Amino acid sequence: MEVLRNCFPSSVRRFLEELPESLDETYERVLREIKKPTRDQARRLLQCLVVAIRPLRVEELAEIIAVDFDDASGIPKLKPGWRWEDQEQALLTSCSSLIAIVGTSDSRIVQFSHFSVKEFLTSPRLATSSQDILRYHIALQPAHTILAQACLSILVRLDDLIEDSDTKKRSPLAGYAAEYWVRHAQFEDVASRIKGMEDLFDPDKPYFAAWCQLHDIDTPLPYPSVFFQLTSSGLSPRSGARTPLYYAALCGFSNLVEQLIIKHPQHVGAICGCYMTPAVAALSGRHFELAEVLHRNGSSVDPQGRAENSTLHSAAWYGDLEMVQVLVLDYGVDINTKNDVGATPLHFALMGDPALPAAVQLLLDHGADPGMQLLDGSTPLHQASRSGMIEMARILVEHGASVEVQNNRGETPLDVASGEQRDEMIKLLLGHRAK
């Protein structure tokens, strides 16, 4: 407005005519104004902002510029001497008005100045722009590769004697790197493009232990597709020293797993971690082909823990239909295997979270015996009758479950349903009594 106030009317008209007609044109002008010496770093910063899993703080984003992606060793390395003194000003200078810095003095967050900036940078429209603008088009795979590589360059500078707070102080990006680098590396084919992963997973170097100390990814993931948790299934937690092979399998890094099998074959059959074996760790992440490779080399897909629950028990508990099929059809796991209280996977499917009729149906279709009894004599039909699971009970009786069998207290499923006043269940069971 100050410019317009000092212009003659004809100049004002000409100024207005030269204004960008769209947001795209506005952003293109901003990109063209980025100085040549800072173009590469601006592009990397924008790439990282696009794919960051959580908002990045000023010091975290600025740390990426201290990574030499063209190090003579061929592996990107952190160069502490490259760190900016005035990080906020340097970021704003590099990325111009495309970014904004918000938050308190204790936590300054870098974000795009408008949501449309991210949409513009990743848009196919930008991919067809002139060469000076095309360099800023952001494809997701290269962007994830840049951020994963930056994170890895931090992690291979850690050692296992440094406390978490000191580590984070040494590198502001250490916390983010430890927690999220795997998720960036898992995007499409990024893991195969990262340089230096072998160093992080080398058991003879301190970096692997330091990473696990800073953030341990070996925890059952909090969504339904994960098929077991130790607290409910009884599998032994971390019974043994963690191995890089186990973690590589957990991450689904196929090339790295194959290298580690050759270099450290003693780790293939080792028992450790939440999932106990590398093969089960791979299965937990749906890395089925990798699990098969590990299984062929001697890693069990059916370890048993302190309560003798099998992997199939856990899959049934979580109603994980795909995993049940893989374990039974591909690996021949005993579908009627019992734990130390006599529970089969079918019992677990009825007790599970969630308890799915489809899981019960699948187990029965693949040969689960509906007459198997717990140590107290209870059958799956006793369980369904007590809980009022009409659909489950119907499936069980259709597959031959007896309504007359007694538990150790002499109760039939009908007795149990009567005691719980399950009227609809009583009607169903009466209809299937022996004539």
Label for each model-derived stretch:
Residues 1-270, 277-296:
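Leucine/isoleucine-rich amphipathic helices and adjacent mixed helix/strand linkers
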Residues 37, 56, 161, 191, ...:
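Alpha-solenoid repeat scaffolds
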Residues 235-245, 270-280, 304-311, 338-344, ...:
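Ankyrin-repeat boundary/"N-cap" motif
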Residues 247-252, 281-287, 314-320, 348-356, ...:
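Ankyrin repeat A-helix N-terminal signature
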Residues 255-256, 289-290, 322-323, 358-359, ...:
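Conserved ankyrin/ankyrin-like repeat signature
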Residues 259-267, 292-300, 325-334, 361-369, ...:
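Ankyrin repeat domain, specifically the short helix-to-loop turn at the C-terminus of the second helix
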Residues 406-435:
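Leucine-rich solenoid repeat scaffolds
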